[in-house]
């Protein structure tokens, strides 16, 4: 379900649309990631939620549907759209459509407050199973400072 809003930055009104992206070839998402951030290989098993300003794609959240949870595996917002609350609104829009299973993500220490405010909580590594357990365990052994977080299905969110 797309949700349209109007916001103002400086003197320019933004025409915002929050929606789940459903293009089967995922070329727009691939182009967005490769142009603005990093390499991306399209994966049809992911659910992708986007925010557009008019017709411009300005942010995307990628969630992979795993057996017992959704894995937040990508979250990007163009720099000049950051610190305006759009990332929080996009994440809330995505999570509000995922009511059947919790959402798990990894965050760097400086990102943790953002996710805590969005309804996520600490997740001890020993409570995770399967391939993500192996991935996160390996990252910690290699010295990566990551925070493992979970947002339970239907968690209340306070902005």
Model features per residue range: what roles?
Residues 52-54, 151-153:
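Active-site beta-strand termini and strand-to-loop segments that position acidic
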Residues 50, 56-64, 69-76:
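Conserved beta-strand in the GNAT
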Residues 39-43:
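Short loop/turn motifs at secondary-structure junctions and domain boundaries
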Residues 83-96:
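Conserved acetyl-CoA-binding loop-helix of GNAT-fold acetyltransferases
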Residues 1-13, 156-159:
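N-terminal amphipathic/basic-hydrophobic helices that include classical n-h-c signal peptides
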Residues 16-28:
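A short beta-loop-alpha structural element at the N-terminal edge
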Residues 109-136:
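Conserved active-site alpha-helix within GNAT-family acetyltransferase domains
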Residues 98-110:
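Conserved GNAT acetyl-CoA-binding A-motif
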């Amino acid at each position: 379900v797309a949700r349209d809003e109007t916001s103002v930055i400086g003197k320019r009104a933004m025409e915002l649309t929050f929606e789940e992206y459903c293009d089967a070839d995922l070329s727009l998402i691939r182009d967005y990631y490769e142009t603005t951030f990093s390499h991306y290989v399209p994966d049809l098993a992911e659910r992708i939620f986007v925010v557009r300003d008019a017709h411009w794609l300005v942010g995307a959240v990628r969630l992979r549907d795993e057996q017992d949870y959704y894995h937040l595996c990508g979250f990007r917002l163009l720099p000049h759209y950051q610190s305006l609350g759009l990332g929080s609104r996009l994440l809330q829009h995505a999570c509000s459509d995922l009511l059947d299973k919790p959402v798990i993500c990894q965050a760097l220490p400086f990102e943790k407050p953002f996710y805590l405010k969005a309804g996520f909580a600490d997740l001890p590594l020993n409570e995770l199973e399967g391939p993500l357990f192996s991935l996160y365990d390996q990252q910690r052994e290699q010295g990566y400072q990551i925070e493992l977080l979970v947002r339970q299905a239907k968690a209340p969110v306070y902005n």
